[in-house]
Amino acid sequence: AMPTRQIEKMIEVMQGLDDRFELDLMLVPTFPGYLEKLKAKSGTDRRIRFIPPVSMEELVPFSNAYDIGLYLLPPTNFNYAMALPNKFFEFIQARLAVAIGPSPEMARIVRQFDCGIVADDFAPATLARALNSLTAADVDRMKAGSEKAAHVYTAENNAEKVREIVTSVLKEF
């Protein structure tokens, strides 16, 4: 868990959600002090749990038991503004509905496949309002959208593109 990713914003989202929602955070304690800060921020809210990490091989199958993958990454720098993080694709491969802020690259995929919701801004309360408006049918539809996206965004489908890019770059040297 890196402080620059502002995971506390996801805890703030929970503070605006109704009782249907729970948040399980699976964090590697890279910065133990930060993890303790997050636990303190979650307070006594029983809907927020810190669960032990699983291996990379287990991550997608484990995550499939959930309904929604939440990822709110404020655009504090160019890389975060244009991010397509592994976590986002893990959610899609797990066939989850995705709930994000308006990060342009993630939002493009979410809208293209109708695999989640995109908040109007990066305020936790805005994403909470969007999540509270969802019905079970909405979530099921979005999970079906992730199923479609998961078949497009695979290593196998993108391997040839990566080879072409690497070959092109190497030719320049």
Feature locations, PLM:
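C-terminal alpha-helical cap of glycosyltransferases
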Residues: 133-136, 155-173
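Nucleotide-activated donor-binding/catalytic signature segment of Leloir-type glycosyltransferases, i.e.
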Residues: 27, 35-68
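A short, well-ordered alpha-helix in the C-terminal region of glycosyltransferases
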Residues: 140-153, 164
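A conserved mid-protein helix/loop that constitutes part of the nucleotide-sugar donor-binding site
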Residues: 2-16
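Conserved donor-binding/catalytic loop of nucleotide-activated donor transferases
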Residues: 64-67, 88-97, 113, 119
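Nucleotide-sugar-dependent
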Residues: 5, 55-62, 69-89, 99-108
